[in-house]
Amino acid sequence: EIGKSAGEELQKRLESGPLTVRLSIEMCQGIVSSTMPVARIQGRSEKFVLVSGHYDSWYEGATDNGVANAAMMELARVFQENRERLERSVVFAWWSGHSDGRYAGSAWYYDHHWEELKENCVAHINMDICGCKGSDVVGFQTSMLEGADFDREFLKGFNEGEPDPPVSMTRFADQTFWGADIPFAI
């Protein structure tokens, strides 16, 4: 376990140059309780946009899903600083049990917040696998056929040429929320 003083010592040592670290990790398999950070930035309305990602990963996790988590934190910071300008609220949620639990975290949230989601959630943006090194195409998937043209126009600023057409939605990510008729984009 690394506490504050050990962390400060590591930072001091890093100032002298690169370090080699050896980790010893114990893994257990089974059903466990986990935390699921959720933050609400209040706008003028109770209506909200849900921005979600997952914090569990396989392997190193930088691409899936560390970069998206960092982007979500930065979005939350910027929205918080500008909250007086928000027409709608923004809810940020980091799911547990996504990769290993087959979307258990988002399913739990949906089950426990269904009425609020059905009544007030106007859109769900799922951030997953953002910022792949060496990528030259930014793609999208959406449940909003009427929004496909908007997404395509938006992505023109990131891609050379025309973006690929949206890929049809199959079971992955967090389509858990479709039952509440919430438009979804990834």
Show the residue positions of the predicted features.
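Soluble metallo-hydrolase cores and metallopeptidase-like ectodomains found primarily
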Residues: E1-T63, E74-S89, D111
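Active/binding-pocket-proximal capping segment
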Residues: S57, A68, T142-L145
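Short, solvent-exposed loop/turn segments at secondary-structure boundaries
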Residues: G61-N65, V137-G139
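General small-molecule cofactor/ligand-binding pocket signal
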Residues: R22-S24, A93, A185
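Detector for methionine-enriched segments
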Residues: M27, M36, M72-M73, M127, ...
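Extended, hydrophobic alpha-helical segments in both membrane/secreted and soluble proteins
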Residues: V49-Y55, T63-F79, R88-G97, R102-S106, ...
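Metal-dependent peptidase/peptidase-like ectodomains
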Residues: E1-I2, G7-E8, R44-E46, W95-I186
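A short linear-motif detector with a strong N-terminal bias
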Residues: E15-L19, G30, A70-E74, R102-G105, ...
